Amino acid sequence: MDRQFKRTLITTALPYANGPVHIGHLAGVYVPADIYARYLRLRGRDCLLIGGSDEHGVPIALKAKAEGCTPQEVVDRYHELIKRSFEGLGISFDIYSRTTSDIHRRTASEFFKTLYEKGEFVEQTSEQYYDEEAKQFLADRYIIGTCPHCSNDRAYGDQCEACGTSLNATDLIDPRSTISGSAPVLRETKHWYLPLDKHEPFLKEWILDGHKEWKSNVYGQCKSWLDMGLQPRAVSRDLDWGIPVPVEGAEGKVLYVWFDAPIGYISNTKELCPDSWETWWKSEDTRLVHFIGKDNIVFHCIVFPAMLRAEGSFILPDNVPANEFLNLEGDKISTSRNWAVWLHEYLEEFPGKQDVLRYVLTANAPETKDNDFTWRDFQARNNNELVAIFGNFVNRALVLTHKYFDGAVPPKGELTDYDSRTIEEFAAVKQALEHQLDTFHFREALKEAMNLARIGNKYLADTEPWKLAKTDMNRVATILNLSLQITANLAIAFEPFLPFSSAKLMSMLSTDCPFGWDRLGSTDLLPEGHVLGNPELLFEKLEDSVIDAQIQKLQDTKLANEKAAHQAAPIAEDIAFEDFLKLDIRVGTVLECEKVPKADKLLRFRIDDGLGGRTIVSGIAKHYAPEELVGKQVCFIANLPPRKLKGIESEGMILSAEDADGSLRVIMPAAEVAPGSQVK
C-alpha cells in the first residue's frame, strides 16, 4: 500500500437473503474481511466493516412463490438468520443492514436518477419472453426448458445447473414459464443500459496499468473481460419485486439487482454514519476495499467502478482481494442440492467452537485457486494444530507457573544465548504478520501466528524447566517468564483470527485490557508478580464419533440427491398377457437364511411355500444381513426350473426392487398371508 490513507472502508459482498450462509461464503468473503478489520482496529486504524443482506431479485421471488408467501416474508426470515449466524461466528460488522430498508430504496433511486439526468444511460428495446396467461414478462429464472448442450429438461433461462453452461433464455429448446407452465412468446420491452463500452478506456488504464498489485486471479479475470470488449449492461428489468425504476414510463420495471446491491454499501454506511458518510465515500484519503468471491469480480472491479465514475463524486476501490471457491468433500458446494455446511447448523452442533471453524477456513482458504473442505482435515487441524501446538503450549506454561510459583509471573533473571535467540524469533513475528495481512495473504499470516506457538513449544521442550526445578529455580523462573510473555503475545497475534480464543486466553492471563498491536513481540507484557487466572483447556480434541456424524450427514444428503435425481428405467417391450400368466408368483415365509460360503453376494433361504418348503439362493447379501429376513414374508417366482449356484440347488427367484442408489429391497406383502398364496 504505497499511498497513505486516513481511514479504510471495508465492504463485504451482500449475501442473498433466500437461504442461510455456508462455509463457502465464510471462506471466500466474511472470515478474511473480519480478520482484516480486526487487524486494522488492533493497530489503532480508523476503519469500518460494512455488511448487509441482498434482498431483491428473481431467486427471492421464486423462493416466495415456492413457499406460498411474500418475498418480504422470505427476506425477513433469512436476513435475521444470516445476521444471527454472523454474530455467532464473531464477524464484527460495524453495521449489518439490508436492501429493503427505506434508506437504501432512497439511495438507490437517487443514484439512478443522478445517472439518468446526466445522460449516462442508453435506452434499448429488445425481445423478451412474455407469459400470456400470467400477463407478465419473464426473467431468466422464470423460464425452464431443455438445455441445447446436455438435454437436461430443467435448465433455466440463464444457466443449466446440470452441465453448468451459461445460457440465454432464447437458447432453450421448448421453453416454458415456471409461473403458468405455458409456452412463452417473445415481446418487445424497453430497458435502460449502462454503456460499459464508454468507460472501457478508463477502466483499462485504471486496472491494467494502475492496479497491477491486485491478486493474480482478480487482475487476470478483469484483463480477460477488458480484452474481449465491454458491452452495455441493462440496469432495469421487468419484475414485480425490487426497487421501482424512478422515472416516467417505467411502470412494472425495477432496478436490476446487480445495480441495486452494491449501492447497499453506500446506503448502509449512510445508515451507520448519517452525518459523516461522505467522508467515507468521497474523500481521497479513504481506502475502499471490497471483499468478495470470484463470481463477483466483474461487478466490483468493472461494473460498480463504472457506476461510481459515471456518478462523479465517489472514490473507487483501492483493492478487491477476491477469493476463489471452496468445495466440500471433493464436490462443488450447492445450495439447491443441500451440499453445504451451514453456519447456523455448525454453531448449534459445535457450541463454543467458532474459532475452530475460523481457523480451518483460514488455513485452507481458497485465496488463489479453488480449495476443498473435508471433515477429516477439520478434525486433524483442530487436534494436531490448535490442541497439540497452540493449546498445549499455553496449558504447559500456565500449569507450570501455578505449580512452581503459585500462579504469579516469576522474575526474569539472566538470559542465555538461547533465550536471546528465542526472543529475536518471536519478536520477528510482528513484521512477518504485518506483511502478510497488509497484502491480504491471510493463510500465510495464520501460519506466522501459529509459528509463534511452535516457538514457545520448542522453547519449553528444549529448556525442560520441570527437570531444572530440582536444582535451579532461578533458571526455571526465567524460562517460565519468557514462556508467559510468548503466551501473552499469542493473545495479540491470534485476536484477528481467533477472537474467542484470544479473549479466553486473556482471561486466563487475568488481563482485562487487551494489549495493543504495537506491543506484539514485547517481553514485558506481563509484569513480575502479576497473578494469573486458573488454566483451562484452550481447545478440545474432536473425537472420531463427532466427525463421523458430520460425514454421515453429508452421505445422507448425497443419497437423497441421488434419489431425487433418479429417473426410472424405460419401459420394456410389450409382452403378451398370456406370457405374464405363465409366471407363478407366490408368497413364502423365510424359515432360515444364511450366507453362502465363498460367495459375498449370495444368501441361502429356506422358504415355507405351503407345499413342503423349498431352497432359494438370492444375490442380495450386500443389502441384507441374514437375520434381518428370518420370519419375513417374501415374493418369489415358483415355476422357474431349478439351477445350481455355488453347489446349491436353487428352486425359484426372490423378487427385489432396485432403488435409486443401487440398493436392493425385497418385495414383501403389506400384510401377512398364508404361505404359498399366489400373487395376482
UniProtKB/Swiss-Prot annotation:
<dbReference type="Pfam" id="PF01588">
    <property type="entry name" value="tRNA_bind"/>
</dbReference>
<keyword id="KW-0479">Metal-binding</keyword>
<keyword id="KW-0030">Aminoacyl-tRNA synthetase</keyword>
<comment type="similarity">
    <text>Belongs to the class-I aminoacyl-tRNA synthetase family. MetG type 1 subfamily.</text>
</comment>
<dbReference type="InterPro" id="IPR001412">
    <property type="entry name" value="aa-tRNA-synth_I_CS"/>
</dbReference>
<dbReference type="InterPro" id="IPR029038">
    <property type="entry name" value="MetRS_Zn"/>
</dbReference>
<dbReference type="InterPro" id="IPR023458">
    <property type="entry name" value="Met-tRNA_ligase_1"/>
</dbReference>
<dbReference type="InterPro" id="IPR014758">
    <property type="entry name" value="Met-tRNA_synth"/>
</dbReference>
<keyword id="KW-0862">Zinc</keyword>
<dbReference type="GO" id="GO:0005829">
    <property type="term" value="C:cytosol"/>
</dbReference>
<keyword id="KW-0820">tRNA-binding</keyword>
<feature type="binding site">
    <location>
        <position position="150"/>
    </location>
    <ligand>
        <name>Zn(2+)</name>
    </ligand>
</feature>
<dbReference type="InterPro" id="IPR004495">
    <property type="entry name" value="Met-tRNA-synth_bsu_C"/>
</dbReference>
<comment type="subunit">
    <text>Homodimer.</text>
</comment>
<dbReference type="InterPro" id="IPR002547">
    <property type="entry name" value="tRNA-bd_dom"/>
</dbReference>
<keyword id="KW-0547">Nucleotide-binding</keyword>
<dbReference type="InterPro" id="IPR014729">
    <property type="entry name" value="Rossmann-like_a/b/a_fold"/>
</dbReference>
<dbReference type="Pfam" id="PF09334">
    <property type="entry name" value="tRNA-synt_1g"/>
</dbReference>
<feature type="short sequence motif" description="'KMSKS' region">
    <location>
        <begin position="332"/>
        <end position="336"/>
    </location>
</feature>
<dbReference type="GO" id="GO:0006431">
    <property type="term" value="P:methionyl-tRNA aminoacylation"/>
</dbReference>
<feature type="binding site">
    <location>
        <position position="335"/>
    </location>
    <ligand>
        <name>ATP</name>
    </ligand>
</feature>
<keyword id="KW-0963">Cytoplasm</keyword>
<dbReference type="InterPro" id="IPR012340">
    <property type="entry name" value="NA-bd_OB-fold"/>
</dbReference>
<dbReference type="Pfam" id="PF19303">
    <property type="entry name" value="Anticodon_3"/>
</dbReference>
<keyword id="KW-0648">Protein biosynthesis</keyword>
<dbReference type="InterPro" id="IPR009080">
    <property type="entry name" value="tRNAsynth_Ia_anticodon-bd"/>
</dbReference>
<protein>
    <recommendedName>
        <fullName>Methionine--tRNA ligase</fullName>
        <ecNumber>6.1.1.10</ecNumber>
    </recommendedName>
</protein>
<dbReference type="GO" id="GO:0005524">
    <property type="term" value="F:ATP binding"/>
</dbReference>
<feature type="binding site">
    <location>
        <position position="163"/>
    </location>
    <ligand>
        <name>Zn(2+)</name>
    </ligand>
</feature>
<dbReference type="GO" id="GO:0000049">
    <property type="term" value="F:tRNA binding"/>
</dbReference>
<dbReference type="GO" id="GO:0004825">
    <property type="term" value="F:methionine-tRNA ligase activity"/>
</dbReference>
<dbReference type="InterPro" id="IPR033911">
    <property type="entry name" value="MetRS_core"/>
</dbReference>
<feature type="binding site">
    <location>
        <position position="147"/>
    </location>
    <ligand>
        <name>Zn(2+)</name>
    </ligand>
</feature>
<keyword id="KW-0694">RNA-binding</keyword>
<dbReference type="InterPro" id="IPR041872">
    <property type="entry name" value="Anticodon_Met"/>
</dbReference>
<keyword id="KW-0436">Ligase</keyword>
<feature type="domain" description="tRNA-binding">
    <location>
        <begin position="579"/>
        <end position="680"/>
    </location>
</feature>
<keyword id="KW-0067">ATP-binding</keyword>
<feature type="binding site">
    <location>
        <position position="160"/>
    </location>
    <ligand>
        <name>Zn(2+)</name>
    </ligand>
</feature>
<dbReference type="GO" id="GO:0046872">
    <property type="term" value="F:metal ion binding"/>
</dbReference>
<dbReference type="InterPro" id="IPR015413">
    <property type="entry name" value="Methionyl/Leucyl_tRNA_Synth"/>
</dbReference>
<feature type="short sequence motif" description="'HIGH' region">
    <location>
        <begin position="15"/>
        <end position="25"/>
    </location>
</feature>
